[in-house]
Amino acid sequence: MIGKWNRLFCCGVALLVLSGEGTMAAAESIEQKVEACAGCHGQDGKPVDKSIPVIWGQQTGYLYIQLRDFKRGDRKNEIMQPIAATFEKDDMLAIAEYFSHKPWPDLGQPRSPKDIAERALTAEHSVGCTGCHLDRFQGDGTVPRLAGQGRDYLAQTMIDFRTRARGNNPGMSDLMIAAPEDDLAALAQYLAGL
């Protein structure tokens, strides 16, 4: 129930941002443009709902690509698509740069128990996550940090890639299809606890 109210709040923030004087395009400074982001992604970088990703401290190139993909319609989300539609390329680059320089928040997620960690590492080895996300899952450039990301967001994102509901990275879909779904749940829990 809390998640539903948080999502409704985020929708309200998005509508406010997109209405009249509050449009993102009309904002004069980067601080004004990113202020609305806090409604969902959190004032302190901790999202208001577990289904919303951490963007503070995320890779600049990755953030830019996601905003671009929301704007193009290559990545679907009823809240983010209308917001991103108001941005020009320079806005998206500035927003990505702004959030990438914020400190990554500690979500207080527990480390995985040994059995979950072992299952997650088996899945990681079969999928090859570290080939792109690097050894400590910190990401680089256009590849996102996964370590410490919200468990629910990670799990849903993996499922969305697996079912091709998220279609802005076909290579990720192929990798997620190759892994057993239970292993992906363990992987999400493991990554969240790093």
Indicate where each model-derived feature is located.
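Conserved hydrophobic/aromatic "anchor" residues
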Residues: 70, 98-99, 124, 161, ...
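Gly/Gly-Pro-rich "capping" loops immediately C-terminal to redox-active cysteine motifs
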Residues: 30, 45-76, 81-86, 130, ...
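Short glycine/proline-enriched turn or capping motifs at secondary-structure junctions
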Residues: 5, 165-173, 177-186
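Cleavable N-terminal signal peptides
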Residues: 12-15, 23-25
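C-terminal capping alpha-helices of c-type cytochrome domains
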Residues: 85-108, 152, 177-194
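Inter-heme linker and motif-flanking segments adjacent to c-type heme-binding CXXCH motifs
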Residues: 46-47, 101-112, 116, 136-145, ...
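Bacterial N-terminal signal peptides that target proteins for export
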Residues: 1-11, 20
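Sequence/structural segment immediately N-terminal to covalent heme-attachment motifs in c-type
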Residues: 25-46, 107, 111-135, 150
